[in-house]
Every structure is written in C-alpha cells, then in structure tokens.
Amino acid sequence: MEEFQRYLELDRFRQHDFLYPLLFREYIYALAHDHGFNSYMLLENIGYDNKSSLLIVKRLITRMYQHNYLMISANDSNQNQFFGYNKNLHSQIISEGFAVIVEIPFSLRLISSFEGAEIVISYKLRSIHSIFPFLEDKLPHLNYTTDVRIPYPIHLEILIQTLRSRVKDASYLHLLRFFLHQYSNWNILIITTKSISIFSKSNPRFFLFLYNSHICQYESIFLFLGNQSSHLRLISSGVLFERLYLHKKIEHFAEVFANDFPVIPCFLKDPFMHYVRYQGKSILASKDTPLLMNKWKYYLVNLWQCHFYVWSHPGRIHINQLSKHSLDFWGYFSSVRLNPSVVRSQMLENSFLINNAPKKLDIIVPIIPLIGSLAKARFCNALGHPISKLTRADLSDFEILNRFLRICRNLSHYYSGSSKKKSMYRIKYILRLSCVKTLARKHKSTARAFLKKVGSEFVQEFFTEEEEFLSLIFPRTSFTLRRLYRGRVWYLDIIFINGLANHE
C-alpha cells in the first residue's frame, strides 16, 4: 500500500483532500482498465486502448460543461444510452475513472483506522458458507425472522450527500453531480429493474461503489438505532460480499463509523437480535414477541422514507415464525424442525425413558427453483427433462465435457451443506444427460448411440467427483468418506453465489 501511495502521490492529495486533479492523470484510467497491479507500477504492457487517452478525457469533461454532448432525449435514449454499451460516447471511461478515484479516500481511511489497532487486515472475502454454521447455532433458539429487502435506488442527491460526508473535494463532487445529472432520464434509469441491470453491467465498478455507499450509510444508521434501545443490541454477522474495495467486515462498523456517532455500537453483548445480509436482502432474527418485530419493521420503514426519501410499504417486510415458515436465503431453503430422540436412563433398579426433542436447522436444496434456473439456462425444459445445449462448433468434446463438469462441480460444492443430498442426484442427472445430448448433437447422432460408442464411463465423473474430492481432504476409510458425503460440508472458498443457485 505504501508503494501504491507513493506512485499515485496520494499523501499530497490526502493532505489537501484533492481528488479532482486525479481525473486528469492518465494512469488512473490505466488502473481502471488493467487488473494486474504490477503493470500499473512498471507502466509496461498497459492493458487499455488509445480510446482512454488523457486528451479524450479532457474533451469529454469540457463537452459536459458545454451542455452539448450528453443531453439525450427520451426518444433516442435507446440508441444513444449514456450509461449503455455505446462505445462512441466514451462515457464508460469517465465512470471508471470516477470509481477508481472516489475509492481512494475510503481505502486511505480504512488503512488509517488499522493504525495502532490490533486488528488483522484481511483482503480476502470470507466464504458465503461461513455464515451457515452461525445460522445453525443461533436460529434454532430464535422464534421469528423478518425478510427485509433493502429498497433502492434512492434519489441522486441523497447519494451525493452520502459521499459528501467522506469526500471533501467540492470540485470533484460538483463534477460527479454534473456527470450524473446530464442524463436527462436518470430518474427512469435508476427506478426500472431493467435499466438498473443495464447500468450495473456496463459500469459495474461505478454501480457497485454507489450501491455500497448507500448500503454502508443505511447499515451504519440501522446498527446505531439498534444500539440505542436499552435491551436491543445487535449481534451482527455478515460480510459485504458484493463490494470491491470496502474491505471492512460488518463486525468492525464500530471503528469505521466512530466519527459519525458519539456512541460506539456494541455488537457482541445481547443475544436478542441477529442481523445477516447478502446484497440487497437481509434477515432480522429475534427471540422476542411479534410486537417487537413489528416495531423494528416500522423503524426500518420510517428510516427509508424519512432519511433516504425512498417509498417503502410495510407490507414488503414479512414477519415469519421459524417453526412454520421456511427461510429462503442464499439459494437454500432453511427451516427449524424438531429432532425427536429417546434417551434411556437407569438409576439403580429403575430405568426411565426420556423424550427429548431439540430444535434443529434443516437446510435443503430448493429443487424446483433450481430446475427452473437450469431450464432458463437451456439445460432442460420446464418439466426438468434434459435437452441438448447449443455450443460453438469449434469446441472439442473435452472442452464441452469440462464445461458441464465445472458447472456440476460448482453446484455440488455450493450445495454440499444440504441435509438431504439425494435431491442433487436429479440435478446431476439433468446435467449428465444434457452433456450427452449436446455431444451427440455435435456428432449428429442419438444419445443412446453416442453412449454405446464411447461407453458409460465417459460421464461417470458427474457422480464420483465429489467423493474423490473429499478423499483428498480426508484420506481415511471408505466408511468415513461415506459418512462425510452424507453429512454437511461447508467450504471456505466460496465467495459468491453460483448464477444457477441464485434463483431469486
């Protein structure tokens, strides 16, 4: 980081809080386009084209101020989308530069917050699976959950105000506001789901930064409100998985927002409330009464409406009883069920049968939504019958087989924590036959004739690969391997949800 600061002359900019001059540094756009840090430092083999030159950036900013370049009417917005894929406008260049520069104050503040503190800096994202042991430990002892979808988007000026509290360069904020306001249909852009998808795909770094800024502001206020209740302090467990350079875990919000609030939230004292979030969906779990959960519901609605000026109806927040409803989260269906057991106890000549029914979190694969995702990706039809998938003609048989195996492996790893793994056999069966039909279609044959020609061992890896993977980790007896394969296995290297598993 010290070498990075020296290269970008960040110390000088940090002293004066100047970000605007960085817009006219060409290496900023090299940073935006290149993903290898060594190439930034050496300025060798820079991976951006001549369209990202400093001259073009200066012309773009000049034309922005002249009001004759970015004004787009509603009629030709489809042809001339400012935030779309039209490379002739070069709008993506500026948005990427904005994203790189505006992250600098956050990164520097993060590093300074670690100075003098005994906190281990980790730049690797925690695995998604790490949250499930936490849920297994806590949810069986709780009564109610609340599914909360964080409303977005918010008004453009609210985003600017959020950034203003952390970015002190008025010139930079003015240009950022001007840059966003130049799009005449901005309000339409940020309201429709389709437009949000287009914006996030064409400008992912910029979109994620704006979204994360909104989420950080919301969660800092929300956790602060939770701490203000005398007996309602929050136990928080979660990670900002979708962020790019906001490395801080949610457990350390106390340090990040210490300057914003006079009272530092305490997260690890009271077991009444638990908060978990991934992307725009969060869960509040509590052991208390529905009355308390209703209070929290209206706290959230008032927070969104009064502070962020986002309309949100209380009916969007659902309060469910854990014993009667399943929890749809992170591609799994989770429910709390009784696990009855009988224990025989003998004292002297008398024996007793003790009925015990502890609660257990049952985590299963949502087979119907998962088949729907496979059908949407053209691996099967709506009824789950495998079909051949269109592939490029120049792909070899090995490449086609390897692609199917990679998809099967990713799904198997992600759903390795399911308590009922037999349902995964159906998914593997669909992928296996889809692979066979795809290869048979390439060779202009039938699936039966193709299997007869190559042998059934050709696709056996779909069913044996998971056990072989476990055998590398646990080199023990076959009985132990079978027990491990039937049990739950949580992997610590899964940092995002597979696209097929994310069926929401």
Curated annotation (Swiss-Prot):
Q: From the UniProt record, which GO molecular function terms apply?
A: RNA binding
What the entry lists under Pfam families is as follows:
Intron_maturas2 (PF01348), MatK_N (PF01824)
Q: Which organism's genome codes for this protein? A: Fagus crenata
Protein name listed in UniProt: Maturase K
User: Keywords on this record?
Assistant: Chloroplast, mRNA processing, Plastid, RNA-binding, tRNA processing
The UniProt entry's GO CC annotations, sorted and at most eight, read: chloroplast
**Alphabetical list of PANTHER family matching this protein:** MATURASE K
Q: What does the record list as GO biological process?
A: mRNA processing; RNA splicing; tRNA processing
- Annotated compartments: Plastid, Chloroplast
- Specify the domain of life of the species encoding this protein: Eukaryota
Q: What is its main location?
A: plastid
Result of altering T477S: In haplotypes K and L
